[in-house]
C-alpha cells in the first residue's frame, strides 16, 4: 500500500522512492526490495545504500519495517539512520614489491581528505585489476584484495588495497 521514510534528511522521500522503484500497488516482494535497498541485483542496478555511500554516508543504516498488514496489503516504513559523512583518511597499498607505489596511486579515485564514495572505491579496484601487473582475481576478492576500515568515532575511513604482483618475465 504505502512506503514511508523516517530519519532521512539528506534525500527526500521522492528521491528515495525513485531509486527504490517500488510503487503503491506493486506486488510486495521482500527479495526485490532488499536488492533495491542494499544491492545484490544486477551490476548496473543503482540502490538506496549506494546513493548514500557514494556521498560519504558509510555509516548509513536502513531497516524496512512492515506495518498495517491487512489481507494482501502491507505498509512499509523505511527507518533510516544516516550518520555523518566519512572522510577518507589513509589510503594504504600493500604487496607492491616490484611496482612503484606512485604508478598504482595514479590509478586510484580515492584520495585522503575526500568524502568516501562507494563508486570511486569500486572504480579504483577495477583500475588496479586491469593494470596488468597484478593478479586481477586476487585484487577483486573482498577477502584478500582490499579492505575498508571505518572509524565512526571520528567519521573517517582507511582504505587498504592489497595487490598480488604477477611474476616478472625472466630471460
What do the predicted segments below correspond to?
Residues 1-171:
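Periplasmic polypeptide-binding modules associated with outer-membrane biogenesis and secretion
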